[in-house]
Amino acid sequence: MSAELPIIPKNELTLDGLKGKKIAIIGYGNQGKAHAQNLRDSGFTVTVGARHPEEAKNDGFETTVICEAADADLVILALPDELQGEIYSEQIEPNLPSGATLGFIHGLAIHYGIISPPRGIGAILVAPKGPGITVRQRYTEGKGVPALLAVAQENKTDTARQIALAWATGIGSARVGV
């Protein structure tokens, strides 16, 4: 069985949903690094929460411990799947502000209930269809990597979709297809 995946019209793909928002990326590996750099180059301030923050610091990011980074409007989990559940429950969930949105780069943790955000916390997916190094390279070339976008749960202010659209735009995916 197949499902039709619509391409989002370009006029819906703007950076507006993230303007004035505090953005944190948890993890600075393959995808986290690319998302952080592309969002920064799109004009946003990004804080990196990482177990090993040295590389992010060297790349010019403000870094902090994960539990402090979780105090953001958009908290992007760029961690290996096997670590997401424990880090979320111990360090992120207790520190999420009311109405925040969790961002996922792949949907395993949400789909299988490893992470179940409370009501009022958004859960969105922006999943580029390529490795982080390609997401970054295409962005710097003025191109992009197509991405899948989904809203699994709305946030308190019903802005999860606008945040996801802005995130996809900020990493360059809107240039080629979301």
Which ranges hold each PLM region?
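Glycine-rich adenosine-cofactor-binding loop
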Residues: K21-H35
